[in-house]
């Protein structure tokens, strides 16, 4: 991938950009095999990759510069701002949005937040695009509600320029810390969720719900999980850390009992909406802590699917799964180190299948999915 920002030394986020994709995949596979070296693996499936540029469905832009000349991008460690509107990881459809946002920031008088001086209002711009219809969700992260009336007043101009903006919100993040969002979300549009579709499964994205940033690879990840589950004698499963329900909605069949658990209520609202559209009455989603939910249950499903954050599922849940001993565990992870650590805490299981998904090209990161079978 050619990147003018990298060539000019202005951005180093894609640390592996100079390596061809096949070399990157080889290095990631070697890393994964090294992490799982202590465990016999029955089958290594071929790694899955997608486009090497223009694949991201989300931009998280730090807003800096001045209200007349805002910059959208990032801050270097020394506080120097960098405009990343030309980042080749973004699809071409993002360029007109960035181009319209800069004059809009001036029109609405949204002074960029200055970290050093602790002054200003507009901290971040968060943009998400749906692959299914090109609709977009735009979030303005502000320090306070001071400029909210001005923003509302100027908004019709932006909506006229960018009719693809289906969901627009303001998020209030009052803390002087590098935290992307606060708890308060104010909707400026009637529509509150962005419609998405992977493999004919309807999905919804709400402002504070996690959604994978590489749709081409994520859709293959979900389809693979569905294929693995269909090959197993499973009538009852849990989907823990389920997010908007991507895994559960793909794996569920009309006669399967499936419970999806996720701590973020916004994500659960999305999952419930999808389940209703699919008419899956035996599929239920609840906004709870995954570990607390699992350890309080006496009824054990045949399969537990986990897709935890980078920290992994942790010892309490590993201990519980070891004791309750579901026949199958599918572990999807964005951090193979913590996954390997967790598998070590599940001594009664063997690894039947492992597959790497290159969700984050040009970096050392990757997603991995593992099928564990009770011995």
UniProtKB/Swiss-Prot annotation:
* Residue numbers binding S-adenosyl-L-methionine: 212, 241, 262, 307
Q: Where is the active site?
A: 334
Could you mention a single GO BP entry for this protein? rRNA base methylation
Supply the InterPro entries for this chain.
23SrRNA_MeTrfase_RlmC, MeTrfase_TrmA_AS, MeTrfase_TrmA_CS, SAM-dependent_MTases_sf, U5_MeTrfase_fam
Q: Which reaction does it catalyse?
A: uridine(747) in 23S rRNA + S-adenosyl-L-methionine = 5-methyluridine(747) in 23S rRNA + S-adenosyl-L-homocysteine + H(+)
For this UniProt entry, the molecular function terms from Gene Ontology, in alphabetical order, are: 4 iron, 4 sulfur cluster binding; iron ion binding; rRNA (uridine-C5-)-methyltransferase activity
What Pfam family does this protein match (any one)?
tRNA_U5-meth_tr
Q: Which CDD domains match?
A: AdoMet_MTases
Task performed by this protein:
Catalyzes the formation of 5-methyl-uridine at position 747 (m5U747) in 23S rRNA.
Stated name of the protein: 23S rRNA (uracil(747)-C(5))-methyltransferase RlmC
From what organism does this protein derive?
Answer: Shigella sonnei (strain Ss046)
Write the gene name.
Answer: rlmC
